[in-house]
Design a protein with these regions (language model features):
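Active-site nucleophile elbow and catalytic-triad environment of alpha/beta-hydrolase enzymes
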Residues: 138, 193-211, 243-247
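Conserved loop-alpha-helix segment in the C-terminal half of the alpha/beta-hydrolase fold
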Residues: 225-262
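Conserved acidic catalytic loop of the alpha/beta-hydrolase fold
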Residues: 88-106
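Catalytic active-site module of serine/aspartate enzymes centered on a nucleophile-bearing elbow/loop
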Residues: 247, 254-291
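Short beta-strand element of the alpha/beta-hydrolase
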Residues: 25-42
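Flexible "cap/lid" loop of the alpha/beta hydrolase fold
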Residues: 116-123, 127, 131-160
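Short beta-strand/loop motif that positions the catalytic acidic residue
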Residues: 215, 221-223
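Conserved alpha/beta-hydrolase
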Residues: 48-77
Length: 291
């Protein structure tokens, strides 16, 4: 198996670590290659998330594909880009990762806001061989609600920076995946939160319906049927709907060329069912080997 560890230089001059594993058609994956450990892992489990999800995805694909993995979300939290995380710069960063890996053409997989990044990549570049969007609707995406959530989060981060937050409940107080948003405190810095406000502000004029005509590569979207999040007033008082637009527009999406998968009963944080969907679809689309 071919292996390499690289660095890609991003739009602000910072670098992100890139792990390359396997051989075959190239798949860019915005996932964390390193399993999360310690208290952070327990926090992820509290939210119903596998701390080793990225690693498991890489290992599950590397015997049939050339996987290019990079923890972009972790990077922007370590190296915030409060004024420059625009859609254009985001796409430029993804292309910089592909360039560092020597990938002229490649498939892309992203989950949640990094799936939305993949849609921007597909619209702004002709280098995609396939697009996989997990937990973000290709049509009727929650751009306005997410701006309100990110703006509220930024306000909370600014307030938290000037005064200590109230004690948080113990990690075991809520069942996995059932977090009470009224008790959650912001632990991010103002710079970390402002970058997402910058991103969603720039996306307010984005017409995802018009964008469909610009998509030429094979594409798959999947959501959990329970992926609906209602935030209380502290977080903007909005409902971020991920599953409903996909279910509601399923026939239209399929007519537009999307393969659509709805995972019954799963919510936004439960991404462990990705591999059984992702690998067969990539193999049939790109020609990578099956297990």
């Amino acid at each position: 198996m071919h292996e390499a560890n690289l660095n890609a230089r991003l739009h602000d001059g910072s670098t992100v670590a890139v792990e390359v594993r396997g051989s075959g058609p190239t798949v860019l994956m915005a996932v964390n290659p390193r399993p999360v450990e310690g208290p952070a892992a327990e926090e992820l489990r509290r939210w119903g998330t596998d701390p080793a999800l990225g690693r498991n995805l890489i290992d599950g694909l590397a015997d049939g594909f050339r996987v290019v993995a990079f923890d972009y979300e972790g990077h922007v939290l370590q190296e915030p880009k409060p004024d420059t995380l625009t859609p254009g710069n985001l796409v430029g960063d993804l292309l910089a990762v592909a360039d560092a890996a020597g990938a002229g053409q490649f498939a892309y997989y992203g989950y949640s806001w990094l799936a939305m990044a993949g849609l921007q990549l597909a619209v702004r570049s002709d280098r995609l061989t396939a697009l996989v969007m997990g937990a973000y609707p290709p049509l009727d995406g929650p751009y306005e609600p997410m701006l309100r959530v990110t703006a509220a989060t930024h306000e909370l981060a600014v307030a938290s920076a000037s005064s200590p937050p109230a004690p948080r409940p113990a990690a075991g107080d809520d069942p996995a995946g059932e977090v009470d948003w009224s008790t959650v405190e912001v632990t991010l810095t103002p710079a970390q939160t402002r970058q997402f406000v910058t991103l969603y502000q720039a996306l307010q004029g984005f017409d995802d319906r018009a964008a469909q005509a610009q998509l030429g590569c094979p594409r798959l979207c999947f959501v959990g049927s329970a992926d609906e999040i209602t935030y209380d007033e502290r977080w903007g008082g909005v409902r971020v709907s991920v599953a409903d637009p996909v279910v509601r527009h399923r026939v239209e999406l399929e007519a537009l060329g999307w393969q659509v998968e709805v995972l019954e009963g799963l919510d936004h944080m439960q991404a462990t069912q990705v591999l059984p969907i992702l690998r067969p679809w990539l193999a049939s689309t790109l020609g990578g080997s099956r297990p």
